[in-house]
């Protein structure tokens, strides 16, 4: 059994398992931190960004590099459409992948790169919420990029400028493998290969293994995957949470006693408590708008954003600020709010109970009807300008601050110290994200809310699950670089532990010792057991082993006619000898049968 790691980011995982002649891909995470090396794409023309000075490395000696870089506050950025870090493509041929198992909508954004124009002919499995919300994430990304096209594409910097530049996140893999975003046509074609599954539903993969999904508690429809053969069990854990939020809670039972546990997507902010961060977030927002300032919250169109709506609206009610408007800007804003209310079966029991009252599981439906939460597809949408007034709270994408409506508000509110931008998504470093907007007077704060398993929670869970082998990213066995003394921020296990990095191949010591074989009824009728002791019978049999669609079946031998060319004049025995021979008893029975002068002699090789 082998595991091939295709990603350098544990929270945007992608790996391939080779097991029983099948290739199973776990997740297709798209690492977007590479976009931090590019200039933002403003929806409205930004004079400041347009007038940034060009930058060319003196030692480059390549005239074609001119115009590919711009400098902002001492930092250099690529002036081109942003590019994304793909999963490793040289380790495995995507055409050979049999199935792709997606854990959650955050881990599927690279799917079109894997399934389109690669010869992929397999099946993609995911839950219904993952498909619906994942499509929204992809649609939002495509819309952000396509509505702000760049007049030219910078390409020479990859070949010539890396030795002169220290762009952010260059350790994500070779920038030459970075790619611009796919199209909606690619998205639709890729998602047409998806088969929706439910929790605990078992899918057969070519008769070799079965795969099933169980709730992971991280987000709507998120799951952990269980791969089972007749005598082996592999568990893949990605994006799991033991916190009580809006998704259905994590299921532990089916994950226990695995031959191998593959663990990814632990918290990116091990020093930040989600509840504490949420409380500080609400207090800061309320204080800012009370002082007449505006609050900008870069966000995704789903996930923690729902919890922010709920907690923030409740806090503003307690502080008497119910008239402060909240704007939700995303090309998929209205669909996102609608889907969250119709996917009741995937919610926690507390949220499900509200559906049967009947009542909306989330308060944002009531907030929209009451005019407190206002969804718009864009700042250019009809009615937005007339409705917009300050002070206000704006939720907008993208959290990288490189594209989306958030770029406009960074430019608009940046000069005022009364305003604040608050980062709650842990995917992007605050300092690198705001770098092209510096210098700015607006305050930038970070209250990361990551509900993924912490290291303490993960260690406790591993002790409970008792896997034989644990396979995880190398980063999880080392303390954070900024806290080298924090030995509690690593994964420790009593079982065999193996680590992986991007491009590595891990050999998991799970040996196949048994194979399931089915016996036909006809052959079973010919079996005559002999009881060797109370409750235990043994029988010998003769049959032919047939393998079809990776299933083994034992059938009676076909009778060959005596004149057939295949017949060799011999027939297989109907019974076989077994066990140890009692020589004394054997001699006694020979004597009883009329054989006289029976003698037994001991020799070096046995008895005669």
Q: Residues of each region from the PLM?
A:
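Acidic/His-rich, metal-assisted hydrolase cores and their charged scaffolds
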Residues: 1-608
